C-alpha cells in the first residue's frame, strides 16, 4: 500500500542521505528508506523531481516499436506516473500472485501503462542496484491480438457500455466486503445486477496502470484480476473475471476499502 506519511519521511531521509554522501557519483545513488518497498519508492520517484532525476539512468534508452532513441537528462520531463489520480490499477492472472505486492526481496519491477483504445503498452523497466531502484529503459509497443476475446479490449467495452456490462456480470455476483461491525473480518454475500450498479466503482476507460512485480500476465489465461488501489485514501476494490465459453465475465467483486 502506498503510504503518504511514510513517503514524506522517506523524502526527508533522502535529503539527509544526500548531505552525507555528496561525494557519491550520480550513477551510484545511495539507497533510501523508501527503496525497501517498491510501492513506497515509486510514489517518491513520481512525486519528487530531484529524486527522479537521480534515479533515471541517462541517457535513457527509449524503444518505440523497433526504433530506439536515447533521452538525455536535459530533455527529461518529470513523469508523475499515476500519482495524480485517486487510484491506480494492478493486473494479475491468479490470486496467489497478489502476494508479490510488498515483497521486499524484488530486484526487477516494471511499471506499465496499458492504453485501451490504441492498444499500446508503455513499460518502464526498474532494477534495484546496490539497494537503490533505478529506471533503466522505457518501451512502447502494440499489444498483440489472438483469436480469443482480448481482455483489454473487453474491459474497455465493459467500462464504457452499461448494457454490455449488464450482460457480462454473473448473477448472483459473489461479493466480499468489510464487516461493518468488525473491521478485522469480512462478509461474503452476493449481489444482483441492480446492486452491482449501485456499489460498483468508477471504472478506468482510457488506460490501465499495472506494476509487474513478477506475476504472469498471460493473454491465454482463463482468469484475470483487476485491483483498484487508492493513493493515500484507503480505497481498495478488486474485480475478478473469468473466461466462460470464450467470453469474459465478472464473477466476483471485493470492496475492502477502509
Locate predicted features:
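Short, well-ordered alpha-helical segments enriched in acidic and aromatic residues
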Residues: 40-47, 51-76, 164-179
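Surface-exposed, charged secondary-structure patches
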Residues: 62-120, 183-235
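Surface-exposed beta-loop interaction hotspot
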Residues: 130-168, 172-187
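Sec-dependent signal peptide cleavage junction
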Residues: 12-58, 62
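Short beta-strand edge/turn micro-motifs at domain boundaries
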Residues: 116-146, 234-258
Amino acid at each position: 500500500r502506498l503510504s503518504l506519511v511514510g513517503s514524506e519521511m522517506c523524502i526527508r531521509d533522502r535529503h539527509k542521505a544526500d548531505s552525507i554522501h555528496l561525494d557519491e557519483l550520480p550513477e551510484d545513488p545511495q539507497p533510501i528508506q523508501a527503496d525497501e518497498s517498491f510501492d513506497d519508492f515509486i510514489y517518491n520517484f513520481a512525486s519528487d523531481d530531484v529524486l527522479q532525476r537521480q534515479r533515471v539512468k541517462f541517457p535513457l534508452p527509449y524503444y518505440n516499436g523497433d526504433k530506439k532513441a536515447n533521452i538525455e537528462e536535459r530533455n527529461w520531463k518529470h513523469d508523475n506516473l499515476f500519482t495524480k489520480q485517486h487510484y491506480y490499477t494492478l493486473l494479475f492472472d491468479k490470486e496467489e500472485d497478489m502476494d508479490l505486492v510488498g515483497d521486499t526481496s524484488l530486484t526487477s519491477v516494471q511499471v506499465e501503462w496499458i492504453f485501451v483504445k490504441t492498444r499500446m503498452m508503455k513499460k518502464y523497466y526498474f532494477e534495484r542496484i546496490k539497494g537503490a531502484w533505478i529506471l533503466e529503459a522505457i518501451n512502447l509497443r502494440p499489444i498483440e491480438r489472438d483469436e480469443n476475446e482480448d481482455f483489454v479490449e473487453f474491459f474497455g467495452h465493459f467500462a464504457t457500455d452499461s448494457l454490455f456490462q449488464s450482460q457480462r456480470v454473473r448473477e448472483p455476483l459473489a461479493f466480499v466486503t468489510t464487516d461493518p461491525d468488525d473491521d478485522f473480518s469480512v462478509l461474503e454475500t452476493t449481489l444482483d445486477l441492480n446492486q452491482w450498479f449501485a456499489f460498483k466503482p468508477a471504472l478506468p476507460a482510457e488506460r490501465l496502470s499495472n506494476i509487474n512485480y513478477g506475476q504472469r500476465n498471460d493473454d491465454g489465461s482463463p482468469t484475470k484480476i483487476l485491483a483498484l488501489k487508492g493513493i493515500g485514501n484507503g480505497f481498495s476494490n478488486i474485480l475478478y473475471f473469468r473466461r466462460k465459453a470464450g467470453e469474459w465475465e465478472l464473477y466476483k467483486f471485493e470492496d475492502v476499502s477502509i
